[in-house]
């Protein structure tokens, strides 16, 4: 039986492997050109090309201008492609009075798997009290929240929230941005049962996956690609070709997300 890296090297399907992309985006975005617009149809085509089972997306318009409209668009996508596209409920802490009502609209929809906040776009640090209504409700319901973090310091700044709201499963995105200080990442993630990271990153350094796995519990690492901001082939390839055991790759590529999101 060929190893995962051998299949990828020769352009063969990675058969019998569950691949779940836990961090993606859909729709137009104002800050850079996306020739295929990140439509749900395009994303499913990309999943099919790579043998990916499903992905969990957030609507770009939800961060930039209109979270209510963005969530409606996401609901349409998950209804059109059940089992292939799942969604995050996109929230904006600037509109803190709307957050709980937005969660309630979609929390019982099986197509939605959690909540997404984007700190860089919404310019609201994790210590802000504006997050509290959503955090308190999500903690009561035991929900999962994907938080945009960029660098080890940003990741570490999420730790107090994870300590306070222990029923929330927090995912810190783009964990390899802080790979130059892997001990700092590991200290936060490995000591908290409710803290995870993902691999979404467009320009990772060579060896960053191996370094992440060396320091961070691989059961806490989720496969994410930023589809369709960027081509998912890059992150898929660097995980499949990484110098780590195939069992670890299987956990990162899909088994960890399957457990966390009950997919």
Question: Language-model features: where?
Answer:
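Generic structural signal for well-ordered alpha-helices
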Residues: 40-44, 71-78, 100-104, 135, ...
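Active-site gating/metal-coordination segments in enzymes
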Residues: 53-54, 62-144, 191
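Histidine-centered divalent metal-coordination motifs
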Residues: 23-29, 148, 174
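Acidic/histidine-rich helix-loop elements
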Residues: 26-38
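Mid-to-C-terminal alpha-helical segments outside catalytic/metal-binding sites
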Residues: 1-22, 37-54, 218-220, 233-263
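Conserved, mostly hydrophobic/aromatic
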Residues: 23, 47, 74, 106, ...
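Catalytic pocket-lining loop regions of alpha/beta-barrel enzymes
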Residues: 110-114, 124-222
